[in-house]
Structures are given as structure tokens and as C-alpha cells.
Amino acid sequence: LTRSDIKLVPWSRGYARTKSEPNSVLFGTVRTEKREDKFTWVGPLAPTAQVVIGEKAANHEPESLSYFNDYKTITIRNDVAEQILLENGVARSNLLSIHDSDLIPRILDSDRADFWAYGERIAFHLLDKRGIADQFESVWTLQEGALYLAVNPETDPAAVQALREALAAVKRSGQHKEILAAYR
């Protein structure tokens, strides 16, 4: 595996490709019961919480997920946070489903949406890069879990084992903790 083998694609495309193409891997995938049989899993890479983020100044205090039916929430197409909202009765018409998480801080800052449902750690990292993280807070936790590498199940088991061994080596070296600390 070389750097040229790694391709950055929108989440939805990467998810579909990893499900259908042997020797493909999707980085940073939440392992859920619905996804369990679709992939071979390597990890865990990092803890994660899928949350709904809102502007602090708005003082949102939702008591249930139905609260979000009165607002517009940004999601990443096919992301676990989007799936959780839909499965719990939030109408698709109240979701602004996009393909690129890098666009979300700009959309939030422009008042085109009220909330963002996504992984808490990476969401606040992206907000921090725009210098607006202190204006937002997590207002609802959808799910806690872990991120894994999702590997197409037809991938050579030796390649999967090599990924597992590489992850174990990174964890043993201490680099894993350094990487996680950079995104807190």
C-alpha cells in the first residue's frame, strides 16, 4: 500500500465503493449492528460519539429527537448520524444531506441550517479550523461507539491481517495516543 493507493472521496461514494469493490477500505467508519455483516472490521481506531451540534447562543434544550423536526439539520449522506435521525422519526425534509463535511462549518456560519449531526470529535475539529468552535455545543448525543476501518469482505485475509498488525504497532508505539490527542 502506498500513498497513491489512497483516494479521498465523498463519504457516500466511499461507502458504496467499499461495499462493492474487493481490496477497498473505508477509513473512520462507525461499526453498527446494521453494518456488521457488510464489512470486515479492523480496529477500534478511536472512540466516537455521534452528536447533534447547535449554536450556543440559541440555548437549545431538546427533550427528544422529535425536537429536530422543527429545524434544519445538516448531515453527511449515508452517515450513521443521518441514519439514526431518520430511524427515529426526523423527517428527511428537515435534513440538509450533503456529501462533504468540509462545507458544513461554512453552512452553519451562514445560518442556512440550525444543527449539524456528526461525529463530535471531527465536527469540533472542523469548526475549530474555521475559528468558530467556541460558538457551538453538543445538544444531543445520538450514539457512542468507536471508529473502525471497514474493509470489503472479499479482501485477501492476509491484507486484513496486515492492517490489524499495523494498527497494533501504531498503538504500541504511542503514536496512536498522539494522533487522538491532536483531535480533541
Regions found by a protein language model. Give the residues of each.
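Extracytoplasmic small-molecule ligand-binding "clamshell" domains
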Residues: 1-37, 97-98, 182
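Ligand-binding cleft/hinge of the Venus flytrap
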Residues: 1-2, 42-44, 65-69, 78-99, ...
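Short acidic active-site motifs
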Residues: 13-14, 103-104, 112
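A ligand-binding cleft/hinge motif common to bilobed small-molecule-binding domains
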Residues: 15-19, 28-38, 114-143
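Hydrophobic residues within well-ordered alpha-helices
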Residues: 18-19, 68, 107-109
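Short Pro/Gly-enriched coil loops immediately N-terminal to beta-strands
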Residues: 40-53, 66-69, 88, 139-146
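Periplasmic-binding protein-like
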Residues: 47-51, 128-167
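Extended ligand-binding regions for polar small-molecule ligands
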Residues: 58-62, 66-71, 79, 149-183
